UniProtKB/Swiss-Prot annotation:
Record keyword Secreted present: yes
Lineage of the species this protein comes from: Eukaryota, Metazoa, Ecdysozoa, Arthropoda, Chelicerata
Protein source organism: Tityus obscurus (Amazonian scorpion)
Keywords from the UniProt entry: Secreted
Distribution of this protein across tissues and organs: Expressed by the venom gland.
Role this protein plays: May act to induce hypotension.
Protein name: Cryptide Pep-24
Length: 5
């Protein structure tokens, strides 16, 4: 899952 920076 990609998470925001």
């Amino acid at each position: 899952n990609a998470k925001p920076p």
